[in-house]
């Protein structure tokens, strides 16, 4: 078995060794809940990696959005190049859930666009858990949604070994059962093709490698892994496991039992609706469910099969769905990153799902078993946990209340101090802000300004622009790519001041920022709570010359606690710096490194000029498609999904153009 091994040119320093030892010891002592309190820039991810190396447990890292999960996944892949580091997030690029609006008698059918690359990564994650122990999966809250039965998934796995006596047609039949499709022309993920005694299988967890099984009579003669694009053999295999092409794949026997259960539930529910004088609803439910049953009998699945997942799994009514957590061995470790944001997200998921299902069940669009295709409730989530480490600079009440051990990581290896906090009166705050901005710009740094309302942010942006200050406003309507472009431009000095309401989201740890100002800091509320203030102050913690100005006429409890906590952290870091002779120095990261997503728009222009590209390839459209396919796969492997998706669209256009020419 492969062991977790951190590969890094750095060794743990500052508070890291103490935190690693404390948390690892707690895990060995079977502590269920622990908290790692780590300030911005203290190297929490590196600490997490070292804890994983120490305890050697399969690990799930839970992040609160896809972007943060992708960042963490990239970092863990750097630390663990020889171990399986996987990415598991929602595979929907676009998702419109099924719903019924009774007031207007409007039925909204489920509409979704599935990202094929993310689906591949999800399959890669689940199959890795069955194949090895040294697995780290970085996931979003998508991991608390129903995923199909892991026991059934494992049972349906096809195991092929060199020299094994196996009928080719029997394997083909099994492949169809686990939802692989035969396609001798378009050989893609989740398909297989047959030519004489040769069976090629394109696993659901792969994007560029397929498996060739060669038969001699009823015996498997050879198994090879080959490159789908070139056809070249990569390696010869003694054994291969082919995992199902869908997490909801079900054996024929189980499906027959499930169909009987669905028919019984349908009969019961129809009687119930008729007794309530809901004749239309009863007829609708009968028609829709019978169609689904027919599809399941014919092809093994139907659209919206997840709504029958409880019946397919053979679970009792009201029992929790099987999720990614059930695919892990019992002795797994869970890190909840930015737990103060992630845990409330987990808590909120189930309520929204239930309210939508109520009308679907009531008006005869779905059977009541659809209720059990849902995210876990928070209580169910807790019950599935083994050992948890909450990671946050500002852990909430839940984390601190339940944790039996807390490790603090205040010292930054760079020696950087938490910024100095200055409180100034509200009267004349705009004039004072303008003066402070000018001083900071003269020193060559940038400024973040956080306001309480959208109106104030817009007015302040207009005012500063009128005063000749290069200013931009960051608001919630801006999409991810545009948002990242704004931060990229701020770092490059295209403008100097960024105004916003909530500047706490990831990606705003900008070393060039030397001034963070908080307007109306004394207005208690969500945006001026202790957690929000500490997080906002942290935005200035990447620069050795930074400071924070809070504008307020009174010092609220939240302000007082924030100032006290920041001063405590400054004192600890100053003592450490003095003891070790460290002079705090701003670490200026390469701009491309922090914000890879921002150049996608530029890269798109390059790919959109197809006429120029074709000229450079002597109008050989096939060669250009081949080049773009390689680049698309490389982008996807590097988690650059926007670039990969755009390349996919360009390839599709080229293929269409080729067909037109023919």
Swiss-Prot record:
GO terms for biological process: nucleotide-excision repair; SOS response. Gene3D superfamilies: P-loop containing nucleotide triphosphate hydrolases, UVR domain. Residues 622-657 form the UVR domain. Residues 25-182 form the Helicase ATP-binding domain. Pfam families: Helicase_C (PF00271), ResIII (PF04851), UVR (PF02151), UvrB (PF12344), UvrB_inter (PF17757). GO terms for molecular function: ATP binding; ATP hydrolysis activity; DNA binding; excinuclease ABC activity; helicase activity. It is found in: Cytoplasm. Keywords: ATP-binding, Cytoplasm, DNA damage, DNA excision, DNA repair, Excision nuclease, Helicase, Hydrolase, Nucleotide-binding, SOS response. The keyword Ribonucleoprotein does not apply. CDD domains: DEXHc_UvrB, SF2_C_UvrB. Residues 429-595 form the Helicase C-terminal domain. GO terms for cellular component: cytoplasm; excinuclease repair complex. SMART domains: DEXDc, HELICc. It comes from the Bacteria. ATP binds at residues 38-45. A motif (Beta-hairpin) lies at residues 91-114. NCBIfam families: PRK05298.1, uvrb. Forms a heterotetramer with UvrA during the search for lesions. Interacts with UvrC in an incision complex. The beta-hairpin motif is involved in DNA binding. The UvrABC repair system catalyzes the recognition and processing of DNA lesions. A damage recognition complex composed of 2 UvrA and 2 UvrB subunits scans DNA for abnormalities. Upon binding of the UvrA(2)B(2) complex to a putative damaged site, the DNA wraps around one UvrB monomer. DNA wrap is dependent on ATP binding by UvrB and probably causes local melting of the DNA helix, facilitating insertion of UvrB beta-hairpin between the DNA strands. Then UvrB probes one DNA strand for the presence of a lesion. Belongs to the UvrB family. This is UvrABC system protein B. It comes from Clostridium botulinum (strain ATCC 19397 / Type A). The lineage of its organism: Bacteria, Bacillati, Bacillota, Clostridia, Eubacteriales.
